[in-house]
């Protein structure tokens, strides 16, 4: 009900965020959603700070962002699964660019393995990249936001953080953890009177990026695989409207509501109906 009311309100927002002058840091900016979000923000007067381990891809994002109108773009090599490197690069950003005012945590990975195929190291590394990286970046950049009671935390979670999915136990666990983390941080900020700091949690279905490895939906009318450019436009719009949740497509809303009262067997039947296991096997089973 809250999500429905929030979306109705966001159709007619009282105000929209102005991006001019914001310092926006994006993790995982070399390709996919992170790259497209950077390109969408480029003409809006922001300073872009791009973090990725793919140096060439990140340089290309920077070039395209400047081509799109960005006047200030800073590129950093950062392995977000490495705590020391995150804090080291965060110090550099503060000294060379300034305090980050919009933090977009987007770096992530999806292995697409079954639970018994995943090694302990697989689980640890997925949690480091997808979840712990967001803890470390929030710890690095949130204090400055708190000091001035202004800022925006944007976390790319997933519909998989709301629904446990086939061949994605490590991924689902990490994305569910992100949702819990960001809801908790938002609660603490609110009750401490720091209501100028906004939070947006992004929960998409599959998006056509390297991460999805050619995943194809068997029921595209209900569960489309979004183009990254379209997804990025929705994300930027959600930030502009200061939405707390962006869940897409609408069918994910329905499933989230249904699992709270339907028998588990019915949920599994719905998974079979949309042929999700078959889609995952086709995309990841051959790896």
Could you tell me what each predicted segment is?
Residues 10-49:
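Canonical Rossmann dinucleotide-binding motif of NAD(H)/NADP(H)-dependent dehydrogenases/reductases
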Residues 46-60:
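Conserved glycine-rich Rossmann-like NAD(P)H-binding loop of the short-chain dehydrogenase/reductase
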Residues 55-56, 76-88, 120:
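The beta1-alpha1 cofactor-binding region of Rossmann-like NAD(H)/NADP(H)-dependent oxidoreductases
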Residues 114-115, 119-124:
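Substrate-binding pocket helix/loop in short-chain dehydrogenase/reductase
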Residues 138, 174:
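Active-site helix of classical SDR
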Residues 158:
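Residue(s) in the substrate-gating loop at a strand-loop-helix junction
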Residues 188-252:
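SDR active-site lid
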């Amino acid at each position: 009900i809250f999500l429905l009311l929030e979306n109705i309100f966001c159709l007619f927002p009282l105000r929209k965020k102005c991006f001019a002058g914001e310092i926006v840091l994006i993790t995982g900016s070399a390709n996919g959603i992170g790259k497209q979000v950077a390109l969408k923000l480029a003409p809006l007067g922001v300073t872009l700070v791009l973090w990725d381990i793919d140096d060439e891809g990140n340089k290309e994002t920077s070039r395209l962002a400047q081509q799109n109108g960005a006047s200030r773009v800073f590129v950093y090599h950062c392995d977000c699964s490495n705590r020391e490197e995150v804090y080291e690069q965060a110090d550099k950003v503060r000294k060379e660019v300034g305090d980050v005012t919009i933090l977009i945590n987007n770096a992530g990975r999806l292995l697409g393995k079954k639970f018994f195929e995943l090694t302990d190291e697989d689980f640890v590394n997925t949690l480091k990249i997808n979840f712990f990286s967001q803890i470390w970046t929030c710890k690095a950049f949130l204090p400055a936001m708190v000091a001035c009671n202004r800022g925006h935390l944007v976390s790319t979670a997933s519909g998989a953080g709301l629904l446990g999915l086939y061949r994605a136990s490590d991924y689902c666990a990490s994305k569910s953890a992100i949702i819990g983390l960001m809801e908790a941080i938002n609660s603490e900020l609110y009750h401490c009177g720091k209501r100028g700091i906004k939070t947006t949690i992004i929960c998409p279905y599959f998006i056509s990026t390297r991460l999805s490895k050619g995943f194809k939906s068997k029921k595209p009318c209900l569960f489309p695989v979004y183009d990254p450019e379209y997804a990025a436009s929705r994300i930027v719009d959600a930030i502009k409207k200061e939405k707390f949740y962006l869940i897409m497509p609408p069918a994910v809303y329905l499933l989230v509501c249904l699992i709270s009262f339907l028998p588990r067997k019915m949920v599994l039947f719905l998974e079979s109906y949309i042929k999700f296991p078959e889609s995952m096997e086709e995309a990841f089973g051959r790896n």
